[in-house]
């Protein structure tokens, strides 16, 4: 049976974690994360292969994070992953007041892309959702 959860990555120099899930449903996403104003996350893959939530808080520790959820592993193509990495980069830069462009942005996008690929390969700190539906 497949474990349900997400991979968590810490960029160290930026005050935002990156959480990457593959196929997480709406209930599980809302058990782990909430919007910064307490709103529920809407997970709907009918028109999307992936969803990036840029203004969320992890419920386990109250820390701000960027959360990306891919519908399944097969949609994690270079194009889709790059597209989501761009959104994630924009979100982190906006949060910390960093101007987009140049080497700092290129390195950040590279780190994000690497994290997404690691999640696709099953590498990283996996946070398993336990006690589902209780």
Predicted regions and their residues:
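Non-catalytic terminal regions of proteins
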Residues: 1-49
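Ordered hydrophobic segments in well-structured contexts
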Residues: 6, 17-23, 54-58, 63-71, ...
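Active-site scaffold of zinc-dependent metalloenzymes
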Residues: 34-75, 88
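Long, compositionally biased intrinsically disordered regions
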Residues: 66, 133-134
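A cross-kingdom feature marking charged/low-complexity
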Residues: 76-77, 129
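Active-site recognition of the HExxH zinc-binding catalytic motif
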Residues: 79-91
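Post-HExxH zinc-binding segment in Zn-dependent metallohydrolases
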Residues: 99-132
